[in-house]
Amino acid sequence: MSQIGGATCTWRYLGRFVTLGIYASVALFVWYTLVPTRSKHKDSIAINNNNADPATALIPVHTKNVVIYAATKFFGHPITTERFLATCPDVQNYCRITQEESEFDNADAVLFHNADYRGSTDKFKKMKSQRKPGVPYVLWSLESPTNDMFRPDSHMINWTMTYRTDSDVWAPYGTIVKLKNPVEVDLNAIWEGKTKTATWLASNCITQNHRFDLIKKIIDNGFEIDIWGNCGKQVSQCAGVDNQESPCVLELIKPYKFYISMENSNCKDYVTEKFWKALNDRMTIPIVLARKYYKDLGVPDSAYIAVDDYATLDEFLAHVKKVNKEKDLFLSYHQWRKEWKVIIGSGFSGWCTLCNKLQDKDYILKNPKSYKDVAWWHSFEMCNNQIASKYL
């Protein structure tokens, strides 16, 4: 029976696995440029060629020791080398992160986590006035524009490090690659392991894209969804676990055929771990709001179900109910596993990529770049939060 209640099972940002990116350069002197589009991302190409983790896909020859000054905390928590470069231990041999203000003058890059940036403080005023050529200022963001309105000064930011494919340092929550050779997949075992219909784990119940309203309407129309976390029942067997990387959470979700992978906002390239993990070892069929955002990231159409493929909610419900009952139809959504592989973003691997990009100081100086208005780049115009409204 579908369950909606009020309990807690939150997973904070520090537990999240995500790769994240950076901004850099100089306000009055030099503005640098890195690869602006996904098609040109060397780290993206390396992933596609080698089926590698984004954290280690591009490891250049070590030419210099790098120091990154973290000018902010990460949701109030310290930013340390040990935690944020954990996915690339080899990089730690020549790159380190510091939050000591005494090292600001010697840093190779200065990084700001958008949610912790407070531009009016004396500390940040000093950073604006004492910039050095060849030292990029990097904006790091995990969140969509709907939940994250960073407002730095014009031309302050040189590089962006986000999930967006047009970031200067691309830090995706996950990606998918075509295998060189098909592999065998026991599809019958997937079907036999599915004893429940659909589930959703969530901590954010009130969102501008009305996803919870749509989920409740889907339930009201006879499609069973078990809801866990802040928006539903407490995950009793996972007491004390507050992040989605826990094996306990994997075991909770694995018996379900479908996972509700609707994001808290519908924005360009904003596809988080909830989708990639559902697709990967949890062996579920993700249900998403809009196909465009996943198609743009190269996910095979047959790997998920998008609500906006259907003219009405009744048409959508008729299809998912049929998939739920018919084995062959259900397994058609798992055929992709024979030819594709999901790569989960390793959390903070954007830092690893940043360390590597900072190796080439000559390139930085010869390719100046800055954002006149990074707030526009990361704006509401990149989002469409009205998709669910059509079905309410």
UniProtKB/Swiss-Prot annotation:
> Per the record, what ranges lie on the membrane's Cytoplasmic side?
1-12
Q: Which SUPFAM superfamilies match?
A: UDP-Glycosyltransferase/glycogen phosphorylase
UniProt GO molecular function: alpha-(1->3)-fucosyltransferase activity; fucosyltransferase activity
Lumenal-facing ranges: 36-392
Q: Which GO terms describe its cellular component?
A: Golgi cisterna membrane
Glycosylation positions in this chain: 158
Cofactor binding comment, as recorded: Unlike other alpha-(1,3)-fucosyltransferases, appears not to require a divalent metal cation as cofactor.
Pathway info: Protein modification; protein glycosylation
Look up the EC number in the record and give it. Answer: 2.4.1.-
Look up and give the membrane topology term.
Single-pass type II membrane protein
Phenotype of null mutants: No visible phenotype. Loss of several tetra-fucosylated N-glycans. Loss of tetra- and tri-fucosylated N-glycans in a fut-8 or fut-1 mutant background. fut-1, fut-6 and fut-8 triple mutants lack all N-glycan core fucose with only one fucose present in the bisecting galactose, thus resulting in the loss of tetra-, tri- and bi-fucosylated N-glycans.
Q: What is this protein called?
A: Alpha-(1,3)-fucosyltransferase fut-6
